[in-house]
Amino acid sequence: MKVALFTETYLPYINGVVTHVKILKEGLEKLGHDVLIVTADTNAKRHYVRDGILHCPATSFKRFYDYGLATPVSSTRLKLVKRFNPDIIHIHNEFGVGFSGAMIAKILKVPLVYTLHTMYDDYLYYVAPRPFIPIVKKTSRKYARFLANKANALTGPSKKVEEYFHSCGVYKDVNVIPNPVELDIFLPHNIDEEKKNAFRGKYGISENTMLVCFCGRLGREKSVDVLFKYWAKRVKPADDMKLLIIGGGPSEEELKKLAVELGIQDMVIFTGKVDHKELPPYYASCDLYITASLSDTNSISMLEAMATGLPVLHRYDPLNEGQVKNGINGYIYHDDAEMYNYLVMMKNQTPEEKERFRQSVRDSVNQAGCENLANYLITVYTKAYEKALEKKEKETV
């Protein structure tokens, strides 16, 4: 099967969508399928294809992590995609490249699959001042409905996506397909032991200190401020716990100031932006992963930490239930008291209990590799392709 994957962001950018698309491409190719990535590129002066990637000229969007935005209409893009002759077009974003994917699918009469990765209601402050957010929210939902109605199949990494589509007035079936993780990179036995040991030394963290990490873009939607407030309310220096914040973003300086205001600056370490390939020893040096975010659908950073064996402490989110199971791969907390109780409980586990828990966590994600993701989606693609073929045959009768 020939599959064109349309995504506004791709390598060298790193985010959940990029990782998902990269792993999907690898999985599809391992199974013998042909893949074309269509993406925005702020360095491209013209459309060109290289190494299976169609680069589309784009403008940098400063307010949204400097990602590129391509124009939605391009006859050159249409010509190059037509030359690839896809059986399926699969869009992963809703902006210029995603919209053009939907339009090209219609022009070429190719089935369209649409994956919603992002809860845009949580990101509107990037594009609109507060007084305009209700209007932008309404417009954003209308646009999501428009794209969903164009698609032959919808997918998303959690039930949260289904609920979002319902709120937009879309009641089609949503194929819930959990996000993937690059298992080979994050499995503990593949992580450089020297780098792992050097990490704690670099930050002056003793072996006895419980190191709790969060990894992600530091934007308001990640609720790191909530995590800091919970931490400040309960955790004391005598508890011998430190919070490692891995990543950078627009809220980084604001969060550093908040840590000082809350008096927890000596318990919080900011690493700044870290290259994705350098992440494994960071996770491997930690004892557990924590998040207060309610905007994620199925956090890839969390899954990567789990592949390393880190139990997850996740703030309660009814639409993401089942991703973290108490005592299996982590614990769900509802408030600061519950968060603290779990921290203390896990700090007091014996080495044997910790290792058993880590193995249980790793087991919970061992089916999240590239080929499993590709197989899930090939099933979706095949159904969409067969239905489209059936419809075409009826129209010609």
Stretches with model-predicted labels:
Residues 326-327, 331-337, 345-351:
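Conserved acidic donor-binding segment of nucleotide-sugar-dependent glycosyltransferases
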Residues 148, 273-274, 281-286:
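Short alpha-helical donor nucleotide-sugar binding micro-motif in glycosyltransferases
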Residues 41, 160, 180:
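Carbohydrate-associated surface elements
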Residues 311-314:
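Short hydrophobic beta-strand element within catalytic cores of glycosyltransferases
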Residues 206-231:
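Conserved donor-binding/catalytic core segment of Leloir-type glycosyltransferases
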Residues 294:
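Aromatic "clamp/platform" in nucleotide-sugar-dependent glycosyltransferases that forms part
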Residues 1-45, 49-55, 382, 389, ...:
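N-terminal subdomain of nucleotide-sugar transferases
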Residues 253-274:
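Nucleotide-activated donor-binding/catalytic signature segment of Leloir-type glycosyltransferases, i.e.
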